[in-house]
Amino acid sequence: MVRIPRHLIIAASSWLSKIIIAGVQLVSVKFLLEILGEESYAVFTLLTGLLVWFSIADIGIGSSLQNYISELKADRKSYDAYIKAAIHILFASLIILSSTLFFLSDKLSSLYLTSFSDELKNNSGSYFFIASILFIFIGVGSVVYKILFAELLGWKANIINALSYLLGFLDVVAIHYLMPDSSITFALVALYAPVAILPIIYISFRYIYVLKTKVNFNTYKLLLSRSSGFLIFSSLSIIVLQTDYIVMSQKLSAADIIKYTVTMKIFGLMFFIYTAVLQALWPVCAELRVKMQWGKLHRIIFLNIIGGVFFVGLGTLFIYVLKDYIYSIIANGIDYNISGAVFVLLAVYFSIRVWCDTFAMLLQSMNQLKILWLIVPCQALIGGVTQWYFAEHYGIVGILYGLILSFSLTVFWGLPVYYMYKSKRLA
């Protein structure tokens, strides 16, 4: 009887979860556009871009903890003290970040939301603060998923994540029918409050379980010393991947912002499936590295990259053939006239992401982050300059040019070269 690898079982549940989450986000577009209108929805879209920025609210503790759990599991040792220490650190992070944003929201929103009417700009500070608080809670709560994946219980993480987004979608549907003229604030709270609250509830129960565990200062020190590397890498990666939102906020019209973000959500649904595989594969790679099973590790990675690129190509063809039908379902009445060149560029971009994200995951599972600290700032600089320049001349296509160039000139070749170098030295 063929035994299915556990990481693929977890990945399968991740696929279902990611499909539900991405589907909820896509279907929500129709309701949110009707509630908010085009310009307010464009503001809402830019604010939701902050979700990725505040994913670093866990200050790298989530990834640090995940690797410690995987390593201690491989050695059959308890890791309860690490979980308790991580929760203490995360609580402090939540308080500090929330307090800081209380004072900075007005200034930051005035820089970020500049291309809209005076009425929207006058309320932008409160919108920015509410979004920030919600996303800080989500960022801190995401440590739950790291813990569960490290314990090879990723299916539980997927259930929590999918359920939270489903509840958020039901909230959006409710305000669509009961409060059709709701503000951006109501829309943000409706969609994202459940996503913020459910993981925090789980963390609370998990903390009760480890409450009597003793934690010494060295545990905090170990978590923080390793987390700093993940924090730096995550921050740099976010700058790379979210520069398009900054450029959009300054260079694109409200209509083009909606067109770009909805298209990326559609492709994101496809790419979520591959990221689910990587998420499930991380602890597996960490354990194989500890056990020095390099041949098995290399085979898994090779097969995943080949499968990922093939899947991106097939998915792009499917989206292109059915694009008129897909866009009409998401938001009927909005002009989504997008050239074939955009779809080709998106296929190239996400294929590059398959390659780069896989090697980035490998290096993180090995705690080898120095190359990322060196190369990702170069990528961020190239991406920011090229996207700003090309968006000025080519709009949406220009943003994609910049994204592709930033990856191709840096991490596309740098990460695999460094991985092979390190794996040979450790073997």
Task: Give, region by region, the residue ranges found by the protein language model.
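Interhelical loop/hinge segments that connect adjacent transmembrane helices in multipass membrane
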Residues: 1-7, 122, 183-188, 200-241, ...
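Membrane-water interface segments that mark the loop-to-transmembrane alpha-helix transition
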Residues: 10-21, 59-109, 122, 126-129, ...
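Hydrophobic alpha-helical transmembrane segments
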Residues: 158-208, 378-382, 396-420
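Membrane-interface junctions at transmembrane-helix termini in multi-pass inner-membrane proteins
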Residues: 8, 135-159, 348-378
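Signature of the first transmembrane helix
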Residues: 6-67, 94, 98-102, 134, ...
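Transmembrane helix-bundle signature of multi-pass secondary active exporters and lipid flippases
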Residues: 44-59, 237, 241, 249, ...
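Helix-loop junctions and terminal segments of transmembrane helices
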Residues: 59-74, 150, 267, 271-292, ...
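Interfacial segments at transmembrane-helix termini and the short loops linking adjacent helices
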Residues: 105-130, 254, 320-347, 351, ...
